[in-house]
Structure formats: C-alpha cells, structure tokens
Amino acid sequence: MLKEELEGLNISVGIYQNTEEAFTVPLIPLGLKETKDIDFSVILKDFILEHYSEDGYLYEDEITDLMDPRQACRTPSRDEARVELLMTYFIQLGFAWIRFKKYNTSPRIFFYRYDSLNGVLVSQQNLLLEKASVLFNTGALYTQIGTWRYWQMQAGLQSAIDAFQRAAGVLNYLKETFTHTPSYDMSPAMLSVLVKMMLTQAQESVFEKISLPGIRNEFFMLVKVAQEAAKVGEVYQQLHAAMSQALVKENIPYSWASLACVKAHHYTALAHYFTAILLIDHQVKPGMDLDHQEKCLSQLYDHMPEGLTPLATLKNDQQRRQLGKSHLHRAMAHHEESVREASLCKKLRSIEVLQKVLCAAQERSRLTYAQHQEDDDLLNLIHAPSVVAKTEQEPKGPLSVFLANKQWMPPRSNRFTAEEGDLGFTLRGNAPVEVHFLDPYCSALVAGARGGDYIVSIQLVDCKWLTVSEVMKLLKSFGEDEIEMKVVSLLDSTSSMHNKSATYSVGMQKTYSMICLAIDDDNKTDKTQKISKKLSFLSWGTNKNRQKSASTLCLPSVGAARPQVKKKLPSPFSLLNSDSSSY
C-alpha cells in the first residue's frame, strides 16, 4: 500500500505546484526518498565502549545530535533552512563514517530507503546508502523549491532558475560520486535523465523570466523571444528523447515523458508564432538599421527558403507576409500536436491550468492566421524553416578549463581567410578546442592568433562546447569568405603571483590559504615549546582545540583519563565526503 502511495505521489506533475499561480504551465518536481525510524544509539555506544574503551553513555547528547537531524529531514519544509539541515546531516554522516568504520567493516546498522519513483524498499548495512539518499533528497528539495516559487515576479523566477540549477548540480555530483547504488532512482542512467530534466526546466524558467515584463511588438525583441522559445522546445525534445531510451523508458513516469513531449511542441509553436508576428507586422521606415535587421534575420534560420534573401524579404511586404503565414501554419500544427499529446495522458488531462494554457496559445495562433488568410494561401505558402535555438543563459564552458583559479586574458577577435581551403593552423584537444600550430605565413597568425589560444566563438557561433571535428567543419563551411574567430588565452601565472608579505603590507583581508599558513606557523612554534595533552576521540572541533588538531581521528591514548563531563560536538562543515564515497 505504501509503495503504491509513494509511486502515485512522487510521479505526479500536479503535486508541489504553487496554488496561487493561476496561469502557469506545471513543472516536474522530485519526491523525497522516504525511510523508516532507526535507533542506532545502542549500537554506537557499544562500538565506543569496545573500540575506544570509553563509556558510550557519556556521548548520548552527541548521538542524539546525529539522530535528530535524520528525523527532521524526513518531513522537510520547502526552504533553504531545510536544505541546510540536510547538508548538516550529510556532513555529520561523513564524520560518523570516519569515526566508526573499522578496517573494512562498520557498525551493523540497517538503513532503509524507498525508491522515489516506484516505491520499492531498499535495505543495506551500508552508511553510503544513507549518504546517497540524503544527497538525492537535497536535489529533490531544490526541485520542489523551484516549483513552488512565485512565477509572477522576477525574483521568484530567478529563484526558480537557481533552484533547478542547484538541483542539477547536486544530482550530477551524486551520479559521479556514488556509482553503484542499489536504488534505481539513483542509477547513473536515471540520474542523467533527471539532471537533463532539471536543466531543461531552468531553461524554461529563463524564457518565462524574459516574457514576464511583456513582449513588445518590436523586431529585435521578437527575434530574441522566438529564439529563446525555440531553445526551450529544443531542450524538451532532447529530454523526451532521453526519456525514451531503453534503460529508463520502463521506469520513467509516463506523465513526465508526456509532459516533455507536450512542452516540446508547445514552445516550438511559440517560436514560430513570434517569428510570424515579427515578419507580418514589420514595416521598413526611414532611419532603420536595415543591416542589423538583415543580420538578425539571417541568424534566425539555418538557411533561408529557396529564392528568398534576408534583405529582400525585409523590403518586400508580400514575401514577409507569405513567410509569416507559413510560420503560423507550422505553429498551428505544433499547437495541435501538443493538445493531442496532453489528451492522451490521464494525469495531464486532469491538470486544468495546462489545458487552458495550451488551448489559449492554439486559439491565438488560429485567430492571427485567420486575420491574414487569403483564398490562395494553400497554393502560395512556402515551407517555413525551423527557428534557430539561442539563449542568453549559456553555460560558461567546460569546467576543466573555465574555472576561477585560472587567469584569463580578455577575448580577442581575429579576422582572416582560408587561402585555397587551407586554414594555416591545426587544432587539438576536446571542448574547448585549442589552436595548436600555426603556419608562419598564414593570415590567422597575421590577424593575431597564437598557439595555445582557446576558440570560444566563430562568426558569433558559440564554440566552447564543440569538438575538434565540429569546429573544423564550421571553419571550412565559410570557404574563402572572411572568418571572425574569437579566442581567449591563459595569462602567465607567474605574472600575477603575489608573495605573502606584499599582500599583508597593503592591508588586504587574509585569504583562507593565508590563514592556513599562519596556523601552520603557529603549530610549528607550539611544537617546540610544549607538548599538548592528547584529546578524546569526540573532542575534535571544539572552539578550544580547533587550531590544535587538524584531524578527525584524535583517538584516546591508552593511559588517557576517562572524561568526567559530557563533551559537546559541534556541526562542522568542512567534510563533504570520504575517500570511500562510492559503492
């Protein structure tokens, strides 16, 4: 019975939605991994007595401090305070793993967790199951926070974007760290889909944030909104394809896959609708920047329809209207498909707000087409090309290269041409691609390209995530036309290093590394002056001894006196995982 209730609750797309949002397409949250009550105080006390030769009852408060967060995490509220509580419990589990892991064994405590998708109970005598489940619940809680945010305010939408991105980060960390989990909802294949789903919903939130102030009937604004909508439709299409893979198709909730398909068609339809509006309502007026408009229109498509050019289309009212009506025709087709897909899923049919949004968008496109419809449209309509997906919410680049501890020079633009099909340089590496060797007489070298440069864009096309073959294909596609390639290069690390005395002399705030250096110096001095008394195994981390011991393994000596008072163990935040963090 509990299994069926968990499955029905956690796979519902209607749960955790903000009831005050009257006209918002629902999002997909994750349910928490439920558990059972566990009392491991007796087991830990026995272990302390057996291994450390100390009375376990002296540490009742500390053991209670470990058990209380676990109980509180079972029913967390949807706010940042509960996320902090989950992370506190996760970190305490890391310390417990170090304290009580003996060789290849640990205290025999059974941990129980239910699969969040199908409700199957998993039980193991392994603390790593508990740690992995806490991480999963942290990511799930972030999804519920993102779903619950107020979408009628910019701050609420930004909070939703942040929450979904944090959820994706936590789940991706879980996938890379805990590689052999017994629960299917934490398998690498399922976590990959969940990460993609969170990033997709973050992208949807970006579109809603752009649209919230209102969409002006202005050329450049409509181009931006159309491409953002196309981006959302594209990522939802990719998500639906990922959900249809053999490894996850049988276990992914049908309502999730259906909603991904519905949104893929819905946002693709919006992209065609906004493109149609910018074409039909556009008027060439004196003083307009036609060059900029021509460039934007050319970048809106992979290719223009046969017989049309961007500039001629902008100047010709008839061509613009015909192309705009073609986009409306495609928009209505996608709207019809989104409504049909939503009607096939029982859970989606029951979500009234979703049906209203889909029908309203479909009716708007139909009315717009009816206003400009002519008798011979079916004979004269051309096939409207797909809108190129583009967004302002692009990732910075691969983390292996673009990270804060590397110093970068400002981006440089190099303009050059390929002479007789020869670029004059070679490429290497994965994403991002690096310029390796340049011919001494090639035009790229004359334009300013250097060996070791990383290619970030070519003709405004983002290349930070492209492979060598993809970048080479893009470069050769321009033939002998001029190519604008933007590159960045690493700053010489030796030129930006500052010694310790120079930093202190100007009164700068001490960094973490400097504090560690200072502590190390103090420790060396203390060792020559006196020998500190050995500490009991649970006394690490107290304010009195925080700088005297940098280890969590301060075990009692054989001759150490038994402590007479109970010692309070604080909640340290420096240990995220142990070396044995994978199954």
From Swiss-Prot:
<dbReference type="InterPro" id="IPR047138">
    <property type="entry name" value="RHPN1_2"/>
</dbReference>
<dbReference type="InterPro" id="IPR001478">
    <property type="entry name" value="PDZ"/>
</dbReference>
<dbReference type="InterPro" id="IPR036034">
    <property type="entry name" value="PDZ_sf"/>
</dbReference>
<dbReference type="InterPro" id="IPR004328">
    <property type="entry name" value="BRO1_dom"/>
</dbReference>
<dbReference type="Pfam" id="PF03097">
    <property type="entry name" value="BRO1"/>
</dbReference>
<protein>
    <recommendedName>
        <fullName>Putative rhophilin-2-like protein RHPN2P1</fullName>
    </recommendedName>
</protein>
<dbReference type="GO" id="GO:0051497">
    <property type="term" value="P:negative regulation of stress fiber assembly"/>
</dbReference>
<feature type="domain" description="PDZ">
    <location>
        <begin position="412"/>
        <end position="490"/>
    </location>
</feature>
<dbReference type="InterPro" id="IPR038499">
    <property type="entry name" value="BRO1_sf"/>
</dbReference>
<feature type="domain" description="BRO1">
    <location>
        <begin position="26"/>
        <end position="375"/>
    </location>
</feature>
